[in-house]
Amino acid sequence: MNALQEDTPPGPSTVFRPPTSSRPLETPHCEIRIGIAGITITLSLCGCANARAPTLRSATADSSESTGFKNAPDLRTDQPKPPSKKRSCDPSEYRVSELKENLITTTPSRPRTARRCIRL
């Protein structure tokens, strides 16, 4: 058996050589360009399929200082938190709210303890 066979997938003892022809390859290819800090890396992939993958932010290699398109939403900004409900330190107000809660709930619950308010 010849160790160098054409059109044979690689196996444990064979070396794969792709078929050669006189006409240029007609398979589709695509390029992927990655720009990081002024360095551009171009990957050329032969025989790949085109797939669209939308991204939220992108920057070109020519203007790496750019943060992306003007219309792209910026998801890095923190959303403002809703205002928290202020608790009263007055024990009489706490007792009234506790009685209201007891009227609403019908299931028995453990007794509540008063919370201390610490002001800095």
Curated annotation (Swiss-Prot):
Keywords: Apoptosis, Early protein, Host nucleus, Host-virus interaction, Inhibition of host mitotic exit by virus, Modulation of host cell cycle by virus. One of its GO terms (biological process) is symbiont-mediated activation of host apoptosis. Induction: VP1 and VP2 are detected 12 hours post infection, while VP3 only after 24 hours. Pfam families: CAV_VP3. It is found in: Host nucleus. GO terms for cellular component: host cell nucleus. Residues 1-27, 56-120 are annotated as: Disordered. Residues 87-101 have a biased composition (Basic and acidic residues). It comes from the Viruses. Residues 57-69 have a biased composition (Polar residues). May act as transcriptional regulator. Induces apoptosis in infected cells. Element of infectious replication cycle. Belongs to the gyrovirus apoptin family. This is Apoptin. It comes from Chicken anemia virus (isolate USA 26p4) (CAV). The gene is VP3.
